[in-house]
Amino acid sequence: SVVITPTGFSKESDWLQYGGDEGGSRYSKLNQINTLNVKDLEVAWTYKTGHLDRIPEQLSFLRKLVGFQVTPIILPDDVGGNLVFCTPFNEVIALNAATGQQVWFYDPKIDLRPFAGRFNCRGLAQWRNPEKTLSEVCSHSLYLAASDKRLIALDAKTGVPCPEFGSQGIVNVLPYIKNIEPTNQIKAMQLKSPP
């Protein structure tokens, strides 16, 4: 990972959403890195998620079904300014964007056995609750659409599930999608993209 830390980050320069902005444009106006100087970049830090190491030996075949396609996002400075992302097994990790040090880790403990599909998590969504002060739990939340058909809300500062969301931070989406056609494909359906 390469980190460039110009002074005075503004909302326009931060990658706050999965697609960069609320419209998903995947475009940045920043011009600090260009075709002339990109060759001069140096690695600031690296981070290993270790998600493949957590696959039990009896499920080693799953290593072939894992794709790392996440788009990390940056949290606003007032909730830590961390770089947050999810692993293919839906673990959520917050890293100090300047140092690469892990700030917090959340494991939703998805069951790896019943899935026929490939494992992936493409990103997270974030939301600030205008009715809460920044000191309150889940005043700024991250949302994860987990492979096992759960929607999970986490406090962006701590990674702890939001107690007011669903049942202790978790909503089982399966009852809401049972009428999807064709109904015989529901078991194969997985959530991978940000909500």
Where are these regions (language model features)?
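Repeat-blade elements of multi-bladed beta-propeller folds
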Residues: 15-19, 63-91, 116-150, 186-195
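Aromatic-anchored glycine-rich loop motif in surface-exposed flexible loops
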Residues: 92-95, 101-102
